[in-house]
């Protein structure tokens, strides 16, 4: 039974790695459940517009404008795998604004069998996290934020837990640019009876910039992710296909300059939002690193692309996104946010 659970655990971790190009027991902490964030590449958004969807990944976006707002998200990820999120924000005049987030990842149920293959029951596998974020506007140009989170894992009777913090800062320039710097998942594992190892958390430092164009209803965004980890190059099937000599069959190493450019490109994500009137927003992004890691040779795919839209109806905003994470994974994201002050 233990071997079977460990095998399933390895499969689930592979799903997490496919989704976010990171390994480890706690890779789900890098997975977004927000439709807006997913449509724009899955990274902390460098915008400050009181959208509670942004609070989980970027606590510097938490402010007084989020007071008494709520968000509900659902992700149809892959086969029986689905995620759900509940968010709420409140402002306390003396100590700042807070946002609470509960995320739940369900990986479905599996048959429990004896060594002879007889089904004796079933068991579930799931992850969850509880996040409390704080944010404050220091000046008209500066915002800061921090969050503490507990991450838990339950696979059959095996479990693990970790504690982490996020810190973030945001600067709004007088020229219209907004810059954001985030350090996520700084922490440690508390316990682990799955494999008795001390697994690291998926620490990352991400930089983002955005600007709303002056004469067009467009906001452009650019990210450089995983600043702490330069080398993202790997021997993907596409890379091998492109760099194998057709005559000798030998793999030819890419030049140093080409390696540098490709490596830098693997860190870049570009995206944008187009506002149509007062109630409709279109969103899209492209993640070259995701495409480089998960694309397949000689296939025309949309791996690395994501898109979505939002519709505002009175006190509600309904957001939908679809993200092409690999040739077999295109998760669907749905988020409903509401301003309880308007009820």
Which sequence ranges carry the predicted segments?
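Sec-dependent signal peptide recognition
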Residues: 2-10
């Amino acid at each position: 039974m233990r071997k079977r659970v460990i095998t399933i655990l390895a499969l689930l971790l592979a799903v997490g790695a496919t989704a976010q190009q990171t390994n480890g027991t706690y890779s789900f902490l890098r997975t977004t459940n927000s439709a807006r964030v997913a449509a724009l590449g899955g990274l902390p958004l460098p915008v400050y517009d009181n959208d509670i969807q942004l609070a989980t990944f970027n606590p510097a976006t938490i402010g007084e404008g989020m007071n008494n707002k709520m968000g509900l998200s659902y992700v149809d990820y892959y086969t029986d795998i689905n995620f759900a999120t509940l968010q709420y924000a409140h402002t306390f005049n003396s100590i700042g604004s807070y946002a609470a987030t509960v995320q739940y990842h369900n990986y479905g149920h599996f048959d429990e069998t004896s060594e002879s293959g007889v089904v004796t029951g079933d068991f579930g596998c799931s992850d969850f996290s509880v996040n409390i974020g704080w944010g404050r506007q220091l000046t008209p140009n500066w915002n800061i934020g921090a969050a503490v989170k507990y991450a838990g894992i339950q696979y059959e009777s095996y479990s693990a837990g970790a504690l982490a913090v996020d810190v973030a800062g945001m600067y709004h320039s007088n020229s219209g640019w907004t810059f954001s710097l985030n350090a996520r998942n700084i922490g440690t594992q508390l316990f682990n009876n799955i494999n008795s190892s001390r697994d690291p958390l998926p620490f990352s430092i991400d930089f983002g910039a955005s600007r709303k164009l002056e004469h067009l209803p467009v906001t452009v965004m650019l990210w450089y992710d995983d600043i702490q980890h330069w080398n993202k190059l790997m021997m993907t099937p596409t890379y091998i296909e492109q760099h194998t000599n057709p005559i000798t069959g030998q793999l030819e190493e890419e030049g140093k300059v080409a390696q540098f450019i490709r490596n830098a490109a693997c860190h870049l994500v570009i995206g944008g939002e187009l506002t149509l009137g007062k109630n409709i927003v279109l969103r899209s992004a492209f993640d070259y690193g995701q495409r480089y890691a998960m694309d397949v040779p000689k296939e025309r795919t949309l791996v690395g692309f994501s898109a979505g839209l939002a519709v505002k109806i009175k006190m509600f905003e309904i957001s939908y996104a679809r993200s092409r994470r690999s040739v077999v994974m295109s998760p669907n994201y749905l988020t409903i946010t509401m301003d309880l002050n308007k009820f």
